[in-house]
Amino acid sequence: MKEIRQRLKRMADPALARERAPTTGSSVTAPPQRADEIFLEGPRSRFDELITLFRVLLDFLRGFRVLHFVGPCVTVFGSARLKEGHPSYELARKMGAAIAQLGFTVMTGGGPGIMEAANRGAKDVNGRSVGCNIELEFEQQPNAFLDRCVTLHYFFVRKTLLVKYSYAFVVMQGGAGTLDELFEAITLIQTGKIKNFTVVVMGTDYWRDLLKMFEKMAGEGMIHRSDLDLIFATDSVEEAIAHIREKAITPFGLKLVVRHLAWLGEGGLRSS
C-alpha cells in the first residue's frame, strides 16, 4: 500500500514525475527517465501501465483546464532554434500579430524560436497568446509572451491539444518536429479526423523540395491530387491572412465579438 501511495504521488506531482534507474556500486546515478520514455520502453506490469494511463489522463486534464476558454486558435509550428533577427523569426512575429488582429488566439508549442516569435507578435498587438510546452531532458522553458501555458509530459498529448483548439495551421521553417506536426495535421484532415482546416506553409524556398515531394506523391498515386489543395504555400503575410479568413472564418461561422472586458483578453472570435 505504501508503494502504491508513493507511485500515485509521483504521478500527480510533475516535480516528482521523473523516475530514476537504480544506482550502481559507484556514486554515478543514471540519468532520469522522462514520462514518455518510460511509456514507450516496452511492456511493464499492469499496475505500472495503469499509473501511466492516469498520468496521460492528468496531462489531458491540465490541458483542458488551461485552454478551455482561449477561443478559436490558429496554431503556428516552427523551429525552437531560430533567434531574434533571423528572417523566419521576424516573419513569424509579423504573422502572429496578423493572426491576432484577425481575432484568433495564437497557439504555439510555447517554447523559444519560431514559437516565441509568433506569441510575441500576438502580444505586440495586445492579442491573445497561449502555449503547450513539453517536458524535455534539457528543460524547454516557456517563452515570456504567453497569457496561458500548460507544460505536458507526453508529445502525443501536446500534439492533440495543438490541433484540438485550432481552425488553421501555419508552418514556418523547422526541423523534424515541425515536419511531424505538419504531416500530423495533413493526415488528420485527409482522413476526416478533423474538419477541412487549412494548412499554410510559409518559407517557400526552404520548403521547395518538400512541396515537390507532395507533387510527386500525387503523380505516383500515393495521395489524391485534391490533397494538394490542403496546403497553401506563400511568403506573404497578407496572402496568408486572406487565405485564413476565407478558409477558417466564413466556412465555420466564426464571428468577431468585442466584449466590454476586451482589455482582459476576452475579445476575439467565437463560433456561432
Predicted regions located by residue number:
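Acidic/glycine-enriched connector segments
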Residues: 113-172
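Structural motif
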Residues: 72-75, 104-105, 127-131, 147-150, ...
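Solvent-exposed alpha-helices and their adjacent loops that cap or buttress functional pockets
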Residues: 66-69, 98-100, 123, 140-144, ...
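Glycine-rich beta-alpha loop segments
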Residues: 2-33, 37-134, 141
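C-terminal functional extensions of proteins
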Residues: 201-272
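Active-site/ligand-binding-proximal alpha/beta "capping" segment
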Residues: 153-205, 251-253
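Short gly/pro/ser/thr-enriched loop/turn and capping motifs at secondary-structure boundaries
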Residues: 135-141, 178, 206-209
